[in-house]
């Protein structure tokens, strides 16, 4: 009887161990599936964030020959490949010199959509202050870059206009400027240039 009881007890313990192992395996499988799904979702989100964003295609400066300094900046931007629409109302420009940093936001009063010969000759697109920027539409086949709701889509190209005198006190020769064009979502566009040691033209390609 005692041996039988011991045998039954051992069997019960064995069955209990098997059940515990089965439950643990089920928990591990469920956890593994959850983590895999979460990892895939995170990967998709990260890929979208990397793909979306804005890029700076060029930066052009206008030289005030009287003060020998750049008084206007035209920052040309377009969406990254695979990017969704970028609302320029919620995009900001950050500019840094050695001595200061400024942030600029869109002012719908400084907007232009029409023929462009010399961007620096267009009136009404250059802010009078150092904390806003304007928009000059260069290419917009789907008419998404509207004055009140300027949305940058694939294939669009605009110039963001900055009053460099008001924002940075003018940009002298040999000055290093850095910054970003930061959309509400996605990767920012990078601004990085050093002005020439001398200004020989009134229009200077900086980046």
From Swiss-Prot:
Origin: domain of life: Archaea
Cross-referenced InterPro entries: Flagellin/pilin_N_arc, Flagellin_arc
Keyword field contains Coiled coil: no
Subcellular location: Archaeal flagellum
Record flagged with keyword Ubl conjugation: no
GO process annotations (BP): archaeal or bacterial-type flagellum-dependent cell motility
Region forming the signal peptide: none
Any one GO CC term of the record: archaeal-type flagellum
Molecular function in Gene Ontology: structural molecule activity
Key words, A-Z: Archaeal flagellum
Protein function: Flagellin is the subunit protein which polymerizes to form the filaments of archaeal flagella.
NCBIfam families named among the record's database cross-references: arch_flag_Nterm, PRK08541.1
Family according to the record: Belongs to the archaeal flagellin family.
Name listed for the protein in its UniProt record: Probable flagellin PH0548
Organism: Pyrococcus horikoshii (strain ATCC 700860 / DSM 12428 / JCM 9974 / NBRC 100139 / OT-3)
């Amino acid at each position: 009887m005692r041996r039988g009881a011991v045998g039954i007890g051992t069997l019960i313990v064995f069955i209990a161990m098997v059940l515990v192992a089965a439950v643990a395996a089920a928990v591990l499988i469920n956890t593994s599936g959850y983590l895999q799904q979460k990892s895939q979702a995170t990967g998709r989100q990260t890929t979208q964030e990397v793909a979306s964003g804005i890029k700076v295609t060029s930066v052009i400066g206008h030289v005030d020959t009287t003060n020998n300094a750049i008084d206007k900046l035209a920052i040309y931007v377009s969406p990254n490949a695979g990017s969704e629409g970028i609302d320029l109302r919620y995009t900001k420009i950050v500019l840094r010199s050695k001595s200061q940093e400024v942030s600029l936001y869109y002012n719908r009063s400084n907007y232009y959509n029409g023929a462009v010969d010399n961007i620096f000759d267009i009136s009404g697109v250059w802010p009078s202050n150092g904390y806003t920027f304007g928009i000059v539409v260069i290419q917009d086949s789907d008419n998404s870059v509207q004055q009140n709701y300027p949305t940058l889509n694939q294939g669009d190209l605009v110039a963001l206009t900055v009053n460099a005198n008001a924002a940075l006190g003018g940009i002298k020769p040999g000055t290093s400027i850095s910054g970003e064009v930061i959309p509400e979502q996605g990767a920012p566009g990078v601004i990085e240039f050093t002005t020439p040691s001398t200004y020989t033209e009134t229009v200077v390609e900086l980046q």
